[in-house]
């Protein structure tokens, strides 16, 4: 016997902050919705000149991605128009112009979304929590991603004691004073989830950072990240908040 879950409220537990971008062109909308559709900035960095022909090919590629096609189809159904980009964009821009927060409220209502666990670690520079809460009419639960902090600390000319202190203090401040209600790591995307319980020892953090500073390699970056994930879990336990991995 099947169970109909269509009417159940939904909490989105993996999302990122977004603000009102106002009216969008077709190319703007395509870039925003073609997840995995290649960023223009990547090509020159790889030695590919952004000619008109390359831009046209990119546009076709992006509009053929599953995410873009699904977004156009879903918004077409929402607005009651044909699944055509121009028709959808015309109605979307009109809805945003009439009131962005009301438009988002209607979208969330249609999807049954009643709350969002929001990872503020992307995009960078980080968006503040307050404007998101002002524009997005649902419960926002912010979580603090540790990877931007790790990048910042690695760029600082500091030893292990100061590194560890700043890491702990920044996370504690985020949880006690800045409105964050959990911590997140994307270590699975970085060095993987094969983390030994022994990684929690401070000696591993010290030795790993020292090896990184001296350019010794030997898996030192993984060892440092493994230790900091373990330390983050300890901080979450101290503050009685969850950690998302």
Q: Which stretches of residues belong to each language-model region?
A:
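Metal-cofactor-binding active-site regions of metalloenzymes
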Residues: 2-236
